[in-house]
Regions:
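Active-site recognition of the HExxH zinc-binding catalytic motif
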Residues: 307-319
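N-terminal module-boundary/linker segments of secreted carbohydrate-active enzymes
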Residues: 26-140, 400-427
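Active-site-proximal segments of metallohydrolase catalytic domains
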Residues: 157-266
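Bacterial N-terminal signal peptides
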Residues: 12-21
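Bacterial N-terminal signal peptides that target proteins for export
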Residues: 1-11
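Extracellular structured ligand-interaction cores
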Residues: 232-234, 303-304, 313
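Extended, charge-biased low-complexity segments
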Residues: 114-181, 186
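Metalloprotease/metallohydrolase-associated module, dominated by Zn2+-dependent proteases
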Residues: 250-295, 299, 303, 319-427
Length: 427
């Protein structure tokens, strides 16, 4: 049974405010029709923004530092993660400042306030039993998913990231926790000028806003430095509804659906501009709620509702300052490219599972395709032993019982590359 964490939901006083960063969106009557984008051009992506190197005295969120030895390249890597060292078996609660963004783009309005309730009642912020899951990704079948099974025994009443971190360090069933305390703030309205945004429509008739990634990331960083409630010990979380980002000045180079970042900040009593290299560090994330059917369900069934948010929260927890570097890796999600950053969601984009009932937007798409299935869709996440090429894996034992797992889903992940350490990247 799902329940909000008792006493952990607060509403900041105030009313919705508007920040006209640029010219107001065009009138709907004079707006061009959405650009129809084929499924072949829909590529779910995420990115990172900024990065910072905390010192022991830095004013920022609670985190710990560890090292891990990679036997494949004989290198010891250091990493920072949110919370306290799991070996201490302590509980850490991070305040999450939740700011919905109501966005006018291409003559249409996409209100982040519309998706607040389904987000706050999702597995990201509520306790669930992760012993099993109903369905999991299976790209070999037409609807993109198949039956689930045993998922993460021992995580019986946990928020999603808490369960993931406990599985990663084999601490399920212990007193180790990483929890989120969401605090709601007034909605902010952003008007996107025509050159920086438009509307796109997929083959199933779902319409989304499509915004230039550079322009959007600048708006988010401006908010980090201007909002009076910004606190470096909190996570600043910005939520939108059906907004995608494009790159290279081309709306068809789509679709970034979330990012997380870190940056040194000043103002609001947080320190002077002369911090001698030790200014407060603010971590932040943006994620879009995705209507079922925007992405092709066979290719990316799990890419709906909270999938982008689960991706960004997990990556923020495992790499809050964007400085956890590892031996280069690749996966089916990014091949033939390689990455040397420990971004836990990037290897498994498009792979996930179901958890908890979702009643929001469960009808067919505008062209009549029924994609929604009545559940939330968290993304799978690659774990530290996968990036470190550890064999055996010290994470929670996989369902087969022969080794520790390499992703949160373990043996339920349909790709064998995630059932063992990955090889090195081609030279």
């Amino acid at each position: 049974m799902t329940r909000p964490i008792a006493g952990k939901l607060a509403l900041a006083a105030g009313v919705a405010i508007s920040i006209p960063f640029m010219a107001a969106a065009a009138n709907a009557a004079s707006s061009p029709a959405p650009i129809v984008i084929p499924d072949s051009a829909l590529h779910a992506m995420s990115t990172t923004v900024g990065g910072a190197k905390p010192q022991p005295s830095t004013n920022t969120l609670t985190h710990f530092f560890r090292t891990a030895f990679n036997p494949l390249d004989s290198t010891t890597f250091g990493f920072n993660m949110v919370g306290q060292d799991p070996a201490l078996r302590r509980s850490t609660t991070i305040t999450v400042d939740v700011t919905p963004l109501n966005v006018n783009v291409g003559g249409a309005t996409f209100n982040g306030t519309d998706i607040l309730q389904p987000t706050l009642t999702s597995p990201v912020f509520t306790d669930n039993d992760y012993t099993s899951t109903q369905f999991v990704s299976d790209p070999a079948v037409a609807n993109g998913h198949g039956p689930g099974g045993t998922l993460s025994p021992g995580n019986t009443s946990n928020q999603l990231e808490d369960a993931t971190m406990r599985s990663q360090f084999n601490e399920q069933g212990t007193t180790y926790h990483l929890l989120h305390n969401p605090v709601l703030h007034p909605a902010i309205t952003i008007d996107v000028p025509k050159p920086q945004g438009t509307l796109i429509q997929t083959a199933r008739g779902v319409v989304a806003g499509d915004i230039d990634a550079t322009w959007w990331s600048t708006r988010i960083q401006n908010l980090n430095n201007s909002l009076s409630y910004a606190d470096p010990t909190h996570l600043q979380l910005y939520l939108t509804d059906n907004l995608m980002l494009f790159t290279m000045n081309n709306p068809l180079n789509c679709c970034i659906i979330g990012f997380h970042g870190a940056s040194e900040v000043v103002g609001h009593g947080l320190g002077s501009t002369h911090g001698n290299g030790n200014q407060p560090i603010q971590t932040f994330a943006w994620a879009s709620y995705v209507t079922p059917g925007f992405f092709n369900p066979q290719r990316a069934w799990t890419l709906q509702d909270i999938d982008p948010l689960s991706h960004e929260i997990s990556e923020w927890a495992d790499d809050p300052f964007i400085n956890n570097f590892v031996q280069p890796w690749t996966s089916p999600a990014i091949a033939p490219a390689c990455s040397n950053v420990m971004e836990t969601g990037d290897p498994v984009v498009g792979v996930g599972f179901t958890k908890e009932t979702n009643t929001f937007r469960q009808g067919p798409t505008p062209n009549g395709t029924q994609v929604a299935d009545g559940f939330y869709h968290p993304e799978d996440e690659a774990l530290l032993p996968w990036f470190m090429r550890l064999n055996p894996s010290p994470a929670q034992t996989a369902q087969s019982g022969t080794n520790g797992r390499y992703t949160f889903m373990g043996d339920l992940n349909p790709f064998l590359v995630f059932h063992a350490p990955p090889p090195g990247c081609p030279a």
